Each structure stands twice: as structure tokens, then as C-alpha cells.
Regions:
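Residue-level recognition of oxygen-bearing side chains
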Residues: 24, 51, 76
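Short glycine-biased active-site loop of nucleotidyltransferases that positions the nucleotide triphosphate
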Residues: 53-55
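Thiol-based oxidoreductase modules, predominantly thioredoxin-like and allied folds used
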Residues: 38-50
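Local sequence-structure signature of Cys/Sec-based thiol-disulfide redox active-site neighborhoods
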Residues: 2-35
Length: 86
């Protein structure tokens, strides 16, 4: 997994390539990146890891930060912004 940093730390979006909700979450993250300079994230396909699949399989998409906080779907742009700002 490629490590990416922002001014507020590292973010990871867990999902799968066949997940429509994950695509919606990625669109929201891309919109956030346009208004929050320095915000970047990495997307991880949980189907590549049994451990990640067991942890996130029924909850994807899930966004995590370097502090271990998790934002589960469904989330709104406002909730995403609040997660980023806190």
C-alpha cells in the first residue's frame, strides 16, 4: 500500500473494486481534496487481504485516519468534512 500524507495525517479508504458505494465515497473524497489542499488518501481493496475482509467486509466503505478513527458509510459531505477537521 502506498503511504500518502496530508497536513492532517494519513487517510485510508477501505472498499472493493465492485462496490458502488465505495465509488460514491471516492467521489466525495475527491471533492474534499479540491477544497482542502493537502488532503489525500489511499484506497485499499479489502478483497486482497483476509484480515481486512474480516474486519471491514460488511461495513465498506470505511475511511480511517492515522489515529485509528473510522468513518463508516453512509456518510455525508458534512460528516466527511467534520471527520477531516477534527
Amino acid at each position: 500500500m502506498e503511504e500518502i500524507r496530508s497536513a492532517r495525517g494519513r487517510y485510508t479508504l477501505y472498499g472493493t473494486s465492485a462496490c458502488h458505494l465505495c465509488e460514491l465515497a471516492q467521489e466525495m473524497l475527491q471533492q474534499l481534496a479540491q477544497v482542502a489542499p493537502g488532503f489525500v488518501y489511499s484506497a485499499v481493496d479489502i478483497s486482497d487481504s483476509e484480515e481486512l475482509f474480516q474486519r471491514y467486509g460488511l461495513r465498506i466503505p470505511v475511511l480511517t485516519d492515522q489515529r485509528g478513527r473510522e468513518l463508516d458509510w453512509p456518510f455525508t459531505p458534512d460528516q466527511l468534512w467534520a471527520f477531516y477537521r477534527s
